[in-house]
């Protein structure tokens, strides 16, 4: 069987965890190809809410093998805290595996992340302070420490020494902080070696062998399209490529083996942290969406900025990722709103743009051009087919599908796994 990739189509928090959980019972492997414990996601199973950060949502699917891929950066302390938290609630994490080539987040990465944000002041990106950006910087600069290095104390020490030679200069001379001892970091990593060893695999070999054997592999991207370091609203982005192409690189699965690229998109739009957001609401309606949708970050608790659905973004995300399907979430949050605006184009300094503006400056100047749709008041959480939806809700969904340029194959009408309208099978159709 070919592989399937799930990608956030906005700025994150679209409900990728729900989509993964819905499909998890039908797949054999769920791999997280990018990011670290900076991207939280919520999964509701049997009325119980689980807030995951570093672990793939597939950890809660009893039949799937969850894998942290080579494209991730792993905070070992956070990893085992999350595992322990799930096991304390009765979840089975014994199938979890971690790529030997994944990079590690060191304590000094977290220190650098926080002091850099403070140093930038009003120009801060709004990171989670988890050290993800600095860890990816070290990866690209060839100063990174990988999972496999924890099992060779000599190599580990050499790499820590090389990295700290640069980091301590920065910490002491620029940020007026104390230097960090090599032994402190080496001992920190070695303390996890025994527990980590049984989890570590050659993930590229395992996943491709599984595909050769006809198994189904689901790649669960973190963050989202417009946080991608290449395709997002740079510089207000993450440090990896949470797009479909990045999922291929971060899992070691070649692009020709991917059969479905599924975009996860909210029926409205949210964003955490700084950066442009054309449809953002600054009034009571924005507060209403925030409260009704529970729009607060899993990782930081920060309130999410809320706005209307942006079809320009949806079309661009579909183009970048080659989406075959969209999975729309949180349609139920819009229940009770009398009239629902949808952004169909932008006004940039008096010029209409039907597609994403080319430059950062233009996007910062973009003002939404809206079309308006009649709302509904009926409870839709029990709907399981399009025909079950009130006429106005159905019209809204069909309009978004047409404006977004990609078929809507699933629609979330509530937080639970079964509160979903499946229009087209997301694996076999």
UniProtKB/Swiss-Prot annotation:
Recorded name of the encoding gene = purA
Q: What is the lineage of its organism?
A: Bacteria, Bacillati, Actinomycetota, Actinomycetes, Micrococcales
Name by which UniProt lists this protein? Adenylosuccinate synthetase
Identify the GO cellular component terms for this protein: cytoplasm
Write down the species.
Answer: Arthrobacter sp. (strain FB24)
Catalysed reactions, as listed in the record: IMP + L-aspartate + GTP = N(6)-(1,2-dicarboxyethyl)-AMP + GDP + phosphate + 2 H(+)
Active-site positions on this chain: 13, 41
Question: How the protein assembles, per its UniProt entry?
Answer: Homodimer.
Q: Name one GO molecular function term.
A: adenylosuccinate synthase activity
Query: Which UniProt key words apply to this protein?
Result: Cytoplasm, GTP-binding, Ligase, Magnesium, Metal-binding, Nucleotide-binding, Purine biosynthesis
